[in-house]
Amino acid sequence: MNTIGKLFRLTTFGESHGKAIGGVIDGCPAGLFVDMETIERELLRRRPGQSHYTSPRQESDMVQFISGLFRGETTGAPIAFMIDNKDVRSADYDSLSSIFRPGHADYTYFHKYGIRDTRGGGRSSARETAVRVVAGAVAKQLLAPLGIRCTAYTSQIGPVCIPQENAKEYSPEEVESSPIRCPDPNASGLMEAVIETAKKESDSVGGIVDCQISDVPVGWGEPLYGKLHAALGAAMLSINAAKGFEVGDGFALASMRGSEANDQMVAAEDGGISFLSNHSGGISGGISTGQDIRFRVAFKPTPTIGQKQQTVNEQGESISLSAVGRHDPCVVPRAVPVVEAMTWLTLADAYLASRSGRCAHSSLKCNG
């Protein structure tokens, strides 16, 4: 599948070392003014070569819009766009053309399709996420009038995490003040040391991205097979290297009792309701409660490392491999804007669905 979404849809195309990558957004309402500077800012956050902790690959990521815009506004037609690949070194992968790299999609792509693009991972490369960031920036602008806020950040690298007692709602400025997008200064320094150590040892390290969404109205999401947290989970787990997802207190709920886990409610003075906790992460029955939506995404270590590893080639022979190429020692810092982009895409889809299915008689307001 190369398409995500039902009403607000994104289809992506392109490979890591192909001529270009790109996408088509379908379902975006007409009349939305698209601010190109907003798109450029989001792309800059994801772009490689930003710091000592990211891949040295240099890409300008200039977006060319081909259709769907007229004088800066959406027309209701499909919005097609492309980003040229400029800084490719396909020769780095010549020696790997018949080798299955451990932890990559080489083996599975080859056995599924009988052919694979061996240059930089081809279609399975995280280079494709630049397209998601563009589309996410459009979705973000669509939802801007609603005042929804979404902030993702690095909460853990390797064994180092932000202490639970320090966790709070962070601002985008706090997140971006850290080279690895960890808004807790003390934890950020320790995490940077973990990445640095792994890099010096020709190794890599994984981590966790936390995301908080505020001011989503009550009622977004559908029962059963269209649950909002299921859509968010599918979106997050489609990101390269994502291996785990939990919403609210997630797996910790398994060790609680119902008396602890239930988010109890009380009547508010303004006639609405207030929740006494938010263990469910702002979603109940697959539908938003009006509370902050909280979730976490776990990312595995970058599979390409300089240490010698055992693998096989297409002929079925056992060999040893020390990987080459330009790669991040940790994908987490650059995954933060991708998590936000996929969140905006999911919310835009839920927003369009909510406009056709909302009950006109609901008068209870949630006060968080």
Swiss-Prot record:
Residues involved in FMN binding: 123-125, 240-241, 285, 300-304, 326
Keyword Flavoprotein attributed: yes
Reaction(s) the record says it catalyses: 5-O-(1-carboxyvinyl)-3-phosphoshikimate = chorismate + phosphate
InterPro entries, per database record: Chorismate_synth, Chorismate_synth_AroC_sf, Chorismate_synthase_CS
PROSITE patterns: CHORISMATE_SYNTHASE_1 (PS00787), CHORISMATE_SYNTHASE_2 (PS00788), CHORISMATE_SYNTHASE_3 (PS00789)
Required cofactor names: FMNH2
Functional pathway: Metabolic intermediate biosynthesis; chorismate biosynthesis; chorismate from D-erythrose 4-phosphate and phosphoenolpyruvate: step 7/7
Source organism, top-level taxon: Bacteria
Binding site for NADP(+): 46
Keywords, comma-separated and alphabetical: Amino-acid biosynthesis, Aromatic amino acid biosynthesis, FAD, Flavoprotein, FMN, Lyase, NADP
Gene Ontology cellular component terms for the protein in this record: cytosol
Annotated GO biological process: amino acid biosynthetic process; aromatic amino acid family biosynthetic process; chorismate biosynthetic process
Cofactor note: Reduced FMN (FMNH(2)).
EC number: 4.2.3.5
NCBIfam families per UniProt: aroC, PRK05382.1
Subunit structure of this chain's protein: Homotetramer.
Similarity annotation: Belongs to the chorismate synthase family.
Task performed by this protein: This reaction introduces a second double bond into the aromatic ring system.
Protein name per its UniProtKB record: Chorismate synthase
